[in-house]
């Protein structure tokens, strides 16, 4: 019987050198391990990541309280349960915590246990994790959303918007799409060098040069795509699609430069201009009409519902509008957004909600209502590749897991290459069909 015999947590370090939680789950015949990521720009509605707060140790970012919660309260409750009963395990975790935002035991404690149990369950059944979670129809490799140029909270430069990304959707296999992404990344590096700009990389592996404007950033990415020999879409195409091989995606992380007191979007790092919600929506409409943009994540602030509705009405039929801080992988907030008819896609970050079951519920709710799902990493990552498995398990069709550098990002891409090889002729790369615009 796959009975949980031991649950052990420890404090390890993430890709930014900050502590995070790693959990091991044992049964008599299987083992599972999971490490928990953390974000830099976090939404106020996310589940609570429990930190120790002792400034003398890891600058207050230690996670020994969360580790202790796993090794005592959670371990005592889970030992003796069947590791293959994922929903029951996650229900137990939620009951043990007893708060709506996981602030008692910590979402980082709960998530580590939840994912480690899934890993142990998959090993017990002899199935790869994507098959264990998704069943026999799990065969879709995701279109990568590659963060090649950084600004905002991810970089010390004069660019307000956090992420400028490429999406190589015009290919027939994940491996070919990944190759194109890597070639464009190196093309961009050479282009930056030729202009005397920095090629240092940010938390997610993208470049963070000191540019004059947000416009210069997107124009550099478009130029790099062309220099790599690939066709980028035209803004006259629907969403920049047409016969394009590569499209542009943005994550401005608008909550980071929204002044709630003024009710203005303040471009603090570049022009210093201040925009109302209406003006911000019009700004994005101009960009969509000018550049080959297929996806905008967090184009408006997390609680600016009016702004989100304006943006959705203006460009939602042409562009994927992804809610990250808006929805925080939370089915309740997603349902609210669906009822308000805002956005058309949800970013899925497992640590925003805290358990695998709740993550899958959010993905299913999105699918039932015609919203796409983008499985995502965090800026503070580990070598754990579970999100790659989840992307295939759910046939989500899109993954956001950084640029073409830093081994914590490459771990996910390499895992997807292995899965594609394992699936063989069953592997499906959705390409432009990943978008519903």
UniProtKB/Swiss-Prot annotation:
It catalyses: (2R)-2-phosphoglycerate = phosphoenolpyruvate + H2O. (2R)-2-phosphoglycerate binds at residues 162, 349, 378-379, 400. Keywords: Cytoplasm, Glycolysis, Lyase, Magnesium, Metal-binding, Secreted. One of its GO terms (cellular component) is cell surface. Mg(2+) binds at residues 251, 297, 324. It is an enzyme of class 4 (lyase). It is found in: Cytoplasm; Secreted; Cell surface. Its EC number is 4.2.1.11. CDD domains: enolase (cd03313). GO terms for molecular function: magnesium ion binding; phosphopyruvate hydratase activity. Pathway: Carbohydrate degradation; glycolysis; pyruvate from D-glyceraldehyde 3-phosphate: step 4/5. Its cofactor is Mg(2+). It comes from the Bacteria. SUPFAM superfamilies: Enolase C-terminal domain-like, Enolase N-terminal domain-like. Coiled coil: none annotated. This is Enolase. Catalyzes the reversible conversion of 2-phosphoglycerate (2-PG) into phosphoenolpyruvate (PEP). It is essential for the degradation of carbohydrates via glycolysis. Belongs to the enolase family. The active site is at residues 204, 349. It comes from Chlorobium chlorochromatii (strain CaD3). Binds a second Mg(2+) ion via substrate during catalysis. One of its GO terms (biological process) is glycolytic process. Pfam families: Enolase_C, Enolase_N.
């Amino acid at each position: 019987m796959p009975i949980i015999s031991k649950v052990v947590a420890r404090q390890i370090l993430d890709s930014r050198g900050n502590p995070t939680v790693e959990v091991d789950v044992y049964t008599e015949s299987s083992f599972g391990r999971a490490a928990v990521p953390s974000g830099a720009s976090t939404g106020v509605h996310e589940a609570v990541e429990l930190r120790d707060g002792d400034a003398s140790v890891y600058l207050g970012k230690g996670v020994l309280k969360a580790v202790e919660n796993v090794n005592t309260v959670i371990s005592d409750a889970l030992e003796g349960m069947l590791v293959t009963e994922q929903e029951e395990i996650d229900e137990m975790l939620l009951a043990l915590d007893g708060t709506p935002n996981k602030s008692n035991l910590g979402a980082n404690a709960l998530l580590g246990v939840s994912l480690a149990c899934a890993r142990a369950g998959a090993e017990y059944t002899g199935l790869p994790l994507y098959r264990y979670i998704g069943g026999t129809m799990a065969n879709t490799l995701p279109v990568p959303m590659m963060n090649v140029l950084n600004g905002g909270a991810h970089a010390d430069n004069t660019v307000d918007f956090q992420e400028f990304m490429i999406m190589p959707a015009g290919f027939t296999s994940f491996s070919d799409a990944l190759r194109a992404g890597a070639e464009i990344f190196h093309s961009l590096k050479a282009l930056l060098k030729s202009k005397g700009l920095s090629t240092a990389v940010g938390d997610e592996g993208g470049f963070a040069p000191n540019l004059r404007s947000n416009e210069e950033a997107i124009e550099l990415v478009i130029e790099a795509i062309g220099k790599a020999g690939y066709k980028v879409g035209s803004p006259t195409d629907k969403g920049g699609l047409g016969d394009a091989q590569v499209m542009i995606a943005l994550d401005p992380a608008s909550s980071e430069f929204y002044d709630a007191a003024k009710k203005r979007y303040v471009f603090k790092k570049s022009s210093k201009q201040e925009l109302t919600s209406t003006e911000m929506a019009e700004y994005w409409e101009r960009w969509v009409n000018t550049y080959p943009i297929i996806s905008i994540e967090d184009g408006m602030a997390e609680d600016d519902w009016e702004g989100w509705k304006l943006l959705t009405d203006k460009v939602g039929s042409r562009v994927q509008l992804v809610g990250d801080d808006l929805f925080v992988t939370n089915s309740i907030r997603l349902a609210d957004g669906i009822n308000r008819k805002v956005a058309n896609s949800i970013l899925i970050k497992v640590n925003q909600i805290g358990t695998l079951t709740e993550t899958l519920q959010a993905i299913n709710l999105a699918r039932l209502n015609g919203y796409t799902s983008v499985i995502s990493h965090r800026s503070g990552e580990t070598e754990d590749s579970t999100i790659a498995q989840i992307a295939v398990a759910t046939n989500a069709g899109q993954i956001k897991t950084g640029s073409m550098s830093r081994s914590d990002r490459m771990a996910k891409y390499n895992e997807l290459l292995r899965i594609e090889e394992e699936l063989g002729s069953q592997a499906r790369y959705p390409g432009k069909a990943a978008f519903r615009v």
